């Protein structure tokens, strides 16, 4: 395992549902062509990413081909973020009222 709690389809106020949250603040969004390919959907996804970043979340957006063909790269990235404890709220986040 990753050594961190994984939750799926988590609702974040002001953003909506995200695909996964690892730990407290690492968001993984999986983009399939069916829902995320059109120009307006692509734009809406980036608006969501910016909202998540303003709230203090770390966002990784991965495509279906990345998940299916390059999973090791995705996992290495997630493990690196966990190793740096970026999946957890810091004391600074808590002081600034970002921790949820």
Stretches with model-predicted labels:
Residues 1-100:
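Surface segments flanking catalytic/ligand-binding clefts of nucleic-acid enzymes
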